[in-house]
């Protein structure tokens, strides 16, 4: 990896990223590697995951791909086990995998959509932390960042189930932070606003420029964010420089939630 001022923040560290095949997860995986970490790229899509690994290794970094569906507990057990088998430790985890689901008012939502959203966004984060934390304790401590959303602190019409799931992620994170603060494991959330990703495309349609323009204009900063901007926030929370930061929700939303 090319050197930079911060190129050694994660030297000799092992970082695990779920949902790392695209968007914010991909950007974070590459950023961790750029700053010295060995990276475990986890996701459901093998071709995309291996492409992320190639992007890292072609630049001189070290990474592996582990096919993982966070809605399956056995997959997460296998993911953490493979991480320890390959690298011998786990120092950092970014639990990024999530699901937007179908958008509709509450009275029009379905049990099926509820289950799909909560299985990915809440149960997946719960299982991830459940197995990551013991691995980190065995490695002398570590840092977990869970991907929440600006929707985790506000309401948003038609996004009710997604919003509820992200409130839950923040609650789980704060509780875990309290439980492990004196044992060397920090736990925080990052809460992105409107970010130009595949998930946004799935909400509005890849070619729906009108809705995206409207969404961008709702942010006082006047635009949508980038995956790399969120990744920068994730790396801050993960790094030793944030050693006194735990139980915090870092909002990266261009002032959307303080309008």
Please provide the spans of the model-predicted regions.
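Short C-terminal tail/terminal secondary-structure segment
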Residues: 2-6, 100-103, 154, 234-235, ...
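Conserved glycine-rich cofactor-binding loop
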Residues: 14, 21-22, 45
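Substrate-binding pocket helix/loop in short-chain dehydrogenase/reductase
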Residues: 76, 104-106, 110-118, 211, ...
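Catalytic Tyr-X3-Lys loop
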Residues: 107-126, 145, 169
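C-terminal substrate-recognition "lid" of short-chain dehydrogenase/reductases
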Residues: 126-129, 137, 223-252, 257
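Active-site helix of classical SDR
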Residues: 129, 165, 173
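Residue(s) in the substrate-gating loop at a strand-loop-helix junction
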Residues: 149
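Short, small/polar-rich loop/turn modules that mediate ligand/substrate recognition or access, typified
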Residues: 181, 186, 245-247
């Amino acid at each position: 990896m090319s050197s930079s001022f911060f190129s050694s923040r994660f030297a000799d560290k092992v970082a695990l990223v779920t949902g790392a095949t695209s968007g914010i997860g991909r950007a974070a995986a590459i950023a961790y590697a750029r700053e010295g970490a060995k990276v475990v790229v986890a996701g459901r899509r093998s071709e995309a995951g291996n492409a992320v690994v190639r992007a890292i290794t072609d630049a001189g970094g070290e990474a592996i791909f582990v096919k993982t569906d966070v809605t399956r507990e056995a997959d997460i057990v296998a993911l953490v086990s493979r991480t320890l088998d390959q690298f011998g430790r786990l120092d950092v985890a970014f639990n990024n995998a999530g699901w937007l689901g179908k958008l509709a008012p509450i009275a029009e939502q379905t049990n099926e959509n509820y289950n799909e959203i909560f299985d990915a966004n809440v149960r997946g984060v719960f299982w991830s932390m459940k197995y990551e934390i013991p691995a980190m304790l065995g490695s002398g401590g570590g840092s977990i960042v869970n991907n929440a959303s600006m929707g985790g602190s506000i309401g948003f019409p038609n996004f009710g189930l997604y919003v509820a799931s992200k409130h839950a992620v923040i609650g789980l994170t704060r509780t875990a932070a309290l439980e492990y603060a004196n044992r060397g494991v920090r736990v925080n959330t990052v809460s992105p606003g409107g970010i130009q990703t595949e998930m946004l495309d799935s909400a509005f349609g890849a070619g729906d420029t009108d809705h995206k323009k409207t969404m961008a204009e709702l942010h006082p900063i006047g635009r949508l964010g980038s995956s790399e901007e969120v990744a920068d926030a994730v790396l801050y929370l993960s790094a030793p420089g944030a050693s006194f930061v735990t139980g915090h929700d870092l909002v990266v939303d261009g002032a959307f939630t303080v309008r």
